[in-house]
């Protein structure tokens, strides 16, 4: 089972991630991790923090000579902005008398609920842990599983279809060709645009909408389209709720800050149509023995992968920190006031696509790995047989002519 944990505050010394359960023998480079971190920092509409930070992961354990060794992989991403926050975010020195407490919650944020839940007298701890800055650690963690899946022929990619009032009228004409080449080709094409949209005219309109929102002191949300290609039929299961692939993927996507909705394929559009216009008909023939002319199920039927590209759509709400603030009240005095502004982005939808790619990899929540275990097992069964042969040969003083690519999986 692969799982990960993150730690760290937005303005603390560093973010960290521990990935547990990675198979031994998975080839990795520093670029596999840091390239994904760089992608997360891109995107039109980002705030001033991106000019301060240049995220790079420092691997502390679990990798040797460019391959995982089966033990937990620990990584740290330093926060350059920490030097400006050593007093208000000090771990042990009690500087509370020098620091002005934040007692005005921002509507739409975790400020109020976190303040009440944990019994704080200052909102700062809530702000710093609930911040989407934490997703840098998740992208680093997800990059390990992405490298593993890539070696199994599975690719993950995304693009943006909607930013605020601007939407692509239909799926890009190039989408089928890009998916045939693998979802990473789709991601590479999207990355050419500062808003990660495929259509140039739509990209320009989205940039203009972001500029207008910034001028108005407002923010914009949008819709992320995630695709997973190369997934064989049968990943997931209908047998138990915690092995359902669509459930696991939806949970992973919904764990991302500011994501408020998720669907597999065009699910909400399908809900308005009769079944005869929704379900993907089956035809004998083709390379895999069957073929379909449509993929309205989004690559998942009966909570299992159908062998078609998996398609996940995620709705991101507008960021809650507004230059032109909404009404709130002071928790210390109960006085009605305008909400406060915390340095933030105007639009982070392009970056959300990168985070979504990371969390759908099997290093995301435990159910996702449970769903994929059967397929991973079948893909690696030859390696497992070789492990037994290696032991048998070792007893005889012999050596295998071919070593398994992946030696063990917990």
Swiss-Prot record:
Transmembrane segments: none annotated. Reduced FMN (FMNH(2)). Pfam families: Chorismate_synt (PF01264). Pathway: Metabolic intermediate biosynthesis; chorismate biosynthesis; chorismate from D-erythrose 4-phosphate and phosphoenolpyruvate: step 7/7. Its EC number is 4.2.3.5. One of its GO terms (cellular component) is cytosol. GO terms for biological process: amino acid biosynthetic process; aromatic amino acid family biosynthetic process; chorismate biosynthetic process. NADP(+) binds at residues 40, 46. It comes from the Bacteria. Homotetramer. NCBIfam families: aroC, PRK05382.1. This reaction introduces a second double bond into the aromatic ring system. This is Chorismate synthase. It comes from Chlorobaculum parvum (strain DSM 263 / NCIMB 8327) (Chlorobium vibrioforme subsp. thiosulfatophilum). The gene is aroC.
């Amino acid at each position: 089972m692969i799982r990960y944990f993150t730690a760290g505050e937005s303005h603390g010394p560093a973010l960290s991630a521990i990935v547990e359960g990675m198979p031994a023998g998975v080839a990795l480079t520093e670029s596999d991790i840091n390239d994904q971190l760089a992608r997360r920092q891109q995107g039109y509409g980002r705030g001033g923090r991106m000019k301060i930070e240049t995220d790079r992961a420092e691997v502390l354990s679990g990798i040797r000579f460019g391959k995982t060794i089966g033990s937990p992989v620990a990584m740290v991403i330093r926060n350059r902005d920490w030097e400006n926050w050593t007093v208000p975010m000090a771990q042990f020195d009690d500087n509370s008398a020098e620091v002005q407490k934040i007692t005005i919650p921002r509507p739409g944020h975790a400020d109020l609920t976190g303040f009440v839940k944990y019994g704080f007298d200052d909102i700062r701890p809530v702000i710093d842990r609930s911040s989407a800055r934490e997703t840098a650690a998740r992208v680093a963690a997800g990059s390990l599983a992405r490298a593993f899946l890539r070696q199994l022929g599975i690719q993950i990619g995304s693009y943006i279809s909607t930013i605020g009032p601007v939407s692509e009228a239909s799926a890009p004409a190039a989408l089928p060709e890009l998916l045939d080449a693998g979802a990473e080709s789709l991601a590479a094409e999207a990355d050419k645009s500062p808003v990660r949209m495929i259509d140039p005219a739509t990209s320009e309109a989205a940039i203009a909408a972001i500029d207008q929102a910034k001028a108005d002191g407002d923010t914009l949300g949008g819709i992320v389209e995630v695709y997973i290609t190369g997934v064989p039929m049968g990943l997931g299961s209908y047998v138990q709720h915690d092995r359902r692939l669509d459930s696991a993927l939806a949970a992973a996507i919904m764990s991302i800050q500011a994501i408020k909705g998720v669907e597999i394929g065009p699910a909400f559009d399908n809900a308005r149509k009769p079944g005869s216009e929704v379900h993907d008909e089956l035809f004998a023939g083709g390379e895999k023995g069957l073929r379909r002319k449509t993929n309205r199920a989004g690559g998942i039927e009966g909570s299992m992968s159908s062998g078609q590209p998996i398609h996940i759509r995620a709705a991101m709400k507008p960021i809650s920190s507004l230059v032109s603030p909404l009404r709130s009240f002071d928790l210390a005095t109960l006085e009605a006031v305008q909400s406060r502004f915390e340095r933030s982005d105007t639009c982070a939808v392009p970056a959300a696509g990168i985070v979504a790619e990371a969390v759908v990899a099997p290093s995301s929540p435990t159910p996702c790995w449970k769903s994929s275990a059967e397929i991973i097992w079948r893909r690696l069964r030859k390696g497992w047989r070789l492990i037994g042969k290696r032991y048998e040969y070792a007893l005889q003083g012999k050596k295998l002519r071919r070593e398994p690519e992946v030696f063990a999986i917990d």
